[in-house]
Amino acid sequence: MSYITPTKRIFTPEDLSKWVGSPTYNTVLDFIVELQSSVTGKSNDSSYETSSIIDKLSKLLSKVDNLITLHPAHDSVSRFGKIEFRDFYSDLSSKAEEYISEITATAIQETSAYFIESWGNSTRIDYGSGHELNFICFLLCLKELGQITSADYEGLVLKVFTQYMSIMRKLQKEYWLEPAGSHGVWGLDDYHFLPFLFGAAQLSTHPHMKPKSIHNDELVEMYSTKYMYFECINFINKIKTIPNHQGKLSLRWHSPMLDDISAAKNWDKIREGMVKMYKVEVLGKLPIMQHFMFGSLLKCPEGIPEHTDENGHGENPEDHCGHAHVNTWGDCCGIKIPSGIAASESLKHERKGNIPFD
């Protein structure tokens, strides 16, 4: 089998319609759902079947973590992303194939492309659910290569994905990464989706913890290291508001969607709902999927053309942050806004009051 460098192929609503429900779409979705199912009732510290691939992936992520220390961010009065992230990203990009070669001897360039895209965009200094999806695609490529089996799924989520999340939180805090295409208060999290999807499965069989438990700050903080859902809530609580003598603002104020979801009857309903929401808000959204890459392992659906310009050349997706636009304004990328982390840290520095940032 010959391997190729993945490229972006989804540029129009027509392309997107061919993607949704395609064999590759189903492969990606099925993999995510299988990963979710594997951690049903499992906490982050639950035992799982160890394997060489889990160990190799963990070592790979540790190398990424170590790169952050080589490129410390400098103090800045700006509330936007810190440019030192570009140095980190460049260093990672140059080393990615070397790192991946320790995991697989085939399709190194192809799998590396997804791995590199897992850490954000160096031009915009941002990160979002599309980058998170690339990390899943990186793992899926290894599955397609036979490096990963279903026996590894628990370890992939409980060890590898949680380690990836930990590094991403570090990157978000260190470089003040901006949220890519954030829905603001009407989203789950400025950056992530999958920890909610996996986390709901973790809690779906819990005998005592209810969805409304996310409003108990002490409980959330206590269990934030054990359950991904609570880690996300704890993270949001810490960055969305700055406590003062009046106390901090409620989840209802800065994250109304999460507040609404907490009214669900049980975690199993949330588990099911997260999959449905992921299909619509991530896999079914053009602003996200126009960044998705297809190669020999994750094949482009039939009927999606190779888009060319009037001279017959392939479209240059780098005209705007690595993708083409369906309109002339480029507002699919969202308005450039500071991250909640940047706003929160700036306010702490300025010793100001209790102000929410979305």
UniProtKB/Swiss-Prot annotation:
It holds the Pfam family PTPA. GO terms for cellular component: cytoplasm; nucleus; protein phosphatase type 2A complex. SUPFAM superfamilies: PTPA-like. It catalyses: [protein]-peptidylproline (omega=180) = [protein]-peptidylproline (omega=0). Keywords: Cytoplasm, Isomerase, Rotamase. GO terms for molecular function: peptidyl-prolyl cis-trans isomerase activity; protein tyrosine phosphatase activator activity. InterPro entries: Phstyr_phstse_ac, PTPA_C_lid, PTPA_sf. GO terms for biological process: mitotic spindle organization; response to osmotic stress. Its EC number is 5.2.1.8. It is found in: Cytoplasm. Belongs to the PTPA-type PPIase family. PANTHER family: SERINE/THREONINE-PROTEIN PHOSPHATASE 2A REGULATORY SUBUNIT B, SERINE_THREONINE-PROTEIN PHOSPHATASE 2A ACTIVATOR 2. PPIases accelerate the folding of proteins. It catalyzes the cis-trans isomerization of proline imidic peptide bonds in oligopeptides. Acts as a regulatory subunit for PP2A-like phosphatases modulating their activity or substrate specificity, probably by inducing a conformational change in the catalytic subunit, a direct target of the PPIase. Can reactivate inactive phosphatase PP2A-phosphatase methylesterase complexes (PP2Ai) in presence of ATP and Mg(2+) by dissociating the inactive form from the complex. This is Serine/threonine-protein phosphatase 2A activator 2. The lineage of its organism: Eukaryota, Fungi, Dikarya, Ascomycota, Saccharomycotina. The gene is RRD2.
